[in-house]
Amino acid sequence: MGTEANSDVYSTAINGINEIGYPDKEKEEDLGLEVQKKKEKKQKKKKGKNVDDLKQELDLEDHKLSIEELEAKYETSLQGLTSARAAEILARDGPNTLTPPKGTPEIIKFLKQMIGGFSLLLWAGAILCWIAYGILYAQDHNTSRDNLYLGIVLAVVVILTGCFAYFQEAKSTNIMASFNQMIPQQAVVTRNGQKLEIPAKDLVVGDLVDVKGGDRIPADLRIIFAQGCKVDNSSLTGESEAQPRSSEFTHENPLETKNIAFYSTTCLEGTARGFVINTGDQTIIGRIASLASGVGNEKTPIAVEIEHFVHIVAGVAVSVGVLFFIIAICMGYSALNSIIFLIGIIVANVPEGLLATVTVTLSLTAKRMAKKNCLVKNLEAVETLGSTSIICSDKTGTLTQNRMTVAHLWFDDHIHIADTSEDQSHHSFEQTPETWNALCKIVSLCNRAEFKAGQDDVPIMKKVAVGDASETALLKFSEVITGNVMNIRSQNRKVCEIPFNSTNKFQLSIHETDDPQDQRLLLVMKGAPERILEKCSTIMIGGKELPLDESMKDSFQTAYMELGGLGERVLGFCHLYLPEEEYPSSYAFDIESMNFPTSNLCFVGLLSMIDPPRSTVPDAVTKCRSAGIKVIMVTGDHPITAKAIARSVGIISAGSETVDDIAKRLNIPVEQVNKREAKAAVVNGGELKDMSSEELDDILTNHAEIVFARTSPQQKLIIVEGCQRQNYVVAVTGDGVNDSPALKKADIGIAMGIAGSDAAKNAADMILLDDNFASIVTGVEEGRLIFDNIKKSIGYTLTKNVAELCPFLIYIIADIPLPIGTITILFIDLGTDIIPSVSFAYEKAERDIMNRKPRRKNVDRLVNQQLALYAYLQIGIIQSVGAFLNYFTVMAEQGFLPHTLVGIRIDWEKINNQDLEDSYGQEWTFSQRQFLEWTGYTAFFVSIVVEQLADLIIRKTRRNSVFQQGLFRNKFLLMGLASQVIIAAFLSYCPEMPYALKFTPLRAQYWFVAAPYALLIFVYDEIRKLFIRRYPGSWWDKNMYY
């Protein structure tokens, strides 16, 4: 969350309204991440933590206690615990480590891949094949092994795709492991009055611990002594500003007070000593870890859809199988043969190639997205992003550039706009006036930040600087303007300095000047604007010092309010040339007694800073809105800043008003405004803390544009759950440890690749390698495209199922020789159809893909009624008729006219019948009949392949004409078309195929018998799409668009 920090420099009130710093105590005392109070009640808690309990935000009181009270509470002292007492507490509380979640054994993970979704259907098919083979083998040891081979192939398909999916999933690491990586290994502790270095896991409540710059905090500490100590809380709270730590109780909120240091955060500088008040799972990070491990693991939308599809296919297969089992029994077949028919029909309905197709398609899309800076960890998350209807986005680093930047300046009684673009090379304000030169000099000199060495060739805005975010922003601004800040500093040698502190709220330094004609020393100062103004009696206007009268104070206040209202951090700057007579170059300045003027200074101007929006974000937010996706900002930053950024990126659009805006416009109290009149809402974490679920649902439902500010990790999780209660598919972005529970709970968690913590990355399903919100929109489009393309692929695959099923039904009902064998069907499903099915992964989006509303859960299905009816009863029937025509043509040309085939099956299949007559009296031996049957298989197979060529082309689009889409733009689809013909020709004409796989060489004319039906399929589908486009919303559109 980068620069969402608060620093005391900016913690100043504007007419009673807190500016951009720490919020008002009364309003904000319960905000941020409240610490779980250690429960000392005697009642025993179950080991398994209740996630709802973890979401409760309770208070910690230890920061309010004196040292004596702490010693009494934890039975400790400034001499530390005794070793014996520490051992007792360690035995009672356990080690200072995070309890790992109960892991799933790898074998279980592997087996889940083997039996989930499509896999279960294929296993069922394989088992049924083996059962059928077993039954036939028991009757006749010389029976065909087709069913045996088919079962083996189905099992191999499941195992291979399962292994592929398992290794893909295995790349993601355990969330808790990344938390443990953040934990310090050693700690310096005082025990028995002596300092010891012990493993951090052996620390207990009451231990007295010392930390220094560079150390990680080994437990939650109540600081009792500190010297220049600053900590980095960014991994926990998202605040990147270094936070000072001291023994003072400064705030009701444990996160805001200075005398608490948190487990796993980093001590940046200085030293500190404190009592351990929480260890392991009781620490804040322990609670977050438990919260992250206790949520999530819901099925992805695509997993739900695949499960739904499996139910449909299984339902159709079993229903049709049972129906024809009954028909077979009624027609006099034995129960055993009827069971064989039942199994054959069920297996014929199983889309054997679809599991591999979906897995490969998702993988290909994941690779394509990686090239667009979206790294997908969970394959199914590819599609989930396309289903997203709400994006809960972090502010800093995602919507913004994650760097403080000078945005506005106020000098000479005018507000000037600075360039906040990535390179800041186009500042439009006038840089020649004397006032500007004076202001620029103060900004350059009154600054402790410095560039690291060895960056001469690095662009200014990308140079690494040592200093906090605000100081760095001022340094880079000065460097862009002046060209060489270090040169200015060397020409204006620093004589003495008072660093910023929270009491004074200003920074001061005294310098020699670079003017050889002027020997006076220059005092420069910056700090909280009204504190700086208090120290001034004059103001520089047009290069001249004028009295600071009420008129100028009003101008200052107006400018200050305007910049503060933009959510910007404002600093004031002033200077004073010290009289040479009183302060010669040899004067001994004393910063303790401050033996130099700190009043009657000359006010020069204001600078305001903000973490500016990324240039690509407004357009991305607009695209989301047109795609029906609501973008909600969820940030830990101040509401004013959050609202300003939300307006600048379009999350709150130009004409939208919040309740506060309406009250201000109508000049009425906020309470009198009807909240539903406000299109936008800015919800403070304090308000959210007191809301019921129904009130939160009301906000999510009735406000189109929402910003949540000052939120804690628990609240972010509650927001995600609130969105999911509305049946939204929720995407969440985050980068800190504090974001991991919400990332895990969301339908798709998106972590930042650059600024993100390991914990956030492991909790997420997707990682943005460039931390850019615009990449999410790219991902949404890819996700929608993959859903469309999987739907097209399923439609393509299902169509030929009818043509594969009908031969078995006619075989049973009409008693004709079998038109196509199971091995032949297998070569369609896992041979000619695989490459074309996968080629849909490369199909471009149709024009309306980002103008559609997000698909609705459980309504807009992957396989809906329209798709099933169109594939099975329309295109599927056409294919069947064409294939049967070719089969009967082959049989007729060889002597068996269609009417003579009806009822011939039993005689045809008798091995000892060597003189079966055809329509012309010719006699056929069993081996001759068998070769002719295989020729019928091949003709039927070739007909399906030819018709599938047309089916492949028409599936390129669902609404647009294929000519609008571009018939030959998808090179992989052309490869798919070619592969079908090549594989079919190879199987038909390769020597030894008749006896190995039951394919025979076909005469050339048989390849063209089904061609008119292929053309009919193409024309029929183009007419369907034309009517859909021409009559939107009509009966045709509703029933023919799948």
From Swiss-Prot:
Stretches assigned to the Cytoplasmic side: 1-105, 171-306, 357-790, 842-861, 957-970, 1026-1042
Record topological domains on the Lumenal side: 127-149, 327-338, 811-820, 885-936, 990-1004
Catalyses which reaction(s): K(+)(out) + ATP + H2O + H(+)(in) = K(+)(in) + ADP + phosphate + 2 H(+)(out)
Molecular function GO terms recorded: ATP binding; ATP hydrolysis activity; metal ion binding; P-type potassium:proton transporter activity; P-type sodium:potassium-exchanging transporter activity
Active site: 394
Cysteine disulfide links: none
Record protein name field: Potassium-transporting ATPase alpha chain 2
Organism of this sequence: Rhinella marina
Organism taxonomic ancestry: Eukaryota, Metazoa, Chordata, Craniata, Vertebrata
Gene designation per UniProt: ATP12A
